[in-house]
């Protein structure tokens, strides 16, 4: 059903991308069951529906939030608070040298325990270390390549311009709520089964590939 909705609102270059993106959306609801989670990268020139890809993820992925740039503190606080998908549009800005720190957090946080931010809070003269985690599903849209380490964690969805007319995925459409209800129901009824089969997935694959494709 998710694949059908994707085909109604976005035109991918390869037909298999519909299944990949649909599976990624479903997996976001189970990401706490996994040790690592792959990122999605919509890569292409202007007017290739990259941002639309993120908008659809924003409608369907778990507790998704879409941004066009953020500070380290805002990024980590958002992920730690929502425990959902973090979507970055115009992600070529991450290639700026001033964003080296936040790129490091993005690159590290594809695994559980990675990308943690610690701050010292002083209350009534007592020091307390607070820890915020940034492990979560993440997706990007950009015209240029991402940082090499960050790109290495991504499933790349190459986008091209198309003449095919597809309707805009407006946020008020009832289908988004219906699909999210189905996805939450799937999580509540199947999370134990997912935890059970996850350790045996990806056998025979190399380390990084196995990490990224096991979910």
Model-inferred region functions:
Residues 58, 62, 101-128:
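Conserved catalytic/switch belt of AAA+ P-loop NTPases
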